[in-house]
Amino acid sequence: MFESNHRRLWLGGTVLIGAMLGLLIALPWFPMASSGKTVQLEFLRSEPDQALLFFGFPGCGEICPIAMERLHAIKSNGGFPIPIQVGLVNIAVDLPAFTVSEYAHSFDPEFAGYHLDQGKLRSLAQDLGLNLPATEGGISTSFSHPDALFLLQHVEDESWRLKQIFSATRLTRQQLLKSL
């Protein structure tokens, strides 16, 4: 009797500790910006007035290909119900600017790639509550980064309002339709 109770307590404690560690490890990757926040995005066109922004890099071996393929699949299978800009913001600032553009176009010719300098990238990530690890000195293909996909709406001039944050690797067309 004592042994079975002890074993249950041990298993329960192990599960609880594992869940807490998982949360502590994953928490920094979750964006903390709330919808309604306004950010300055001088690199986006004012039309169409809706945009989906994803942060990643060419050569990513895990998250980026899945996210970009998912966006392409949603666009190809029924499309977006309204015109939307889809952009990939490069987090590997040491790569040449044309590389991110070519990478985005490889998934869909209408997808755009944006290469910001380190200061603008950090500022934008901070505005959106995105915790990006330091990337100086290059990024390996096994580098893990958040899969946050930001839905934004143009307000005026270079101002965009954050409408919704999605998981880019798990986004469905239905989720997107509900938010537009």
Locate predicted features:
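Cofactor-binding loop segments of dinucleotide-utilizing enzymes, especially the Rossmann-like FAD-
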Residues: F57, V89-I91, H154
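Thiol/selenol-based redox catalytic cores and closely related redox-interacting motifs
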Residues: E110-F111, L116-L171
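Short secondary-structure boundary/capping segments
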Residues: E42-R45, G78, S140-S142
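Structural microenvironment flanking redox-active thiols in thiol-disulfide oxidoreductases
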Residues: I66-L124
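Short active-site neighborhood of thiol/selenol oxidoreductases, capturing the structured segment around
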Residues: L44-L71
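Extracytoplasmic
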Residues: E47-P48, P81-V86, S144-D147
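N-terminal targeting signals for export/organelle localization
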Residues: M1-L41
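Short, low-complexity, Pro/Ser/Thr/Gly-rich segments in the mature regions of secreted, periplasmic
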Residues: R170-S179
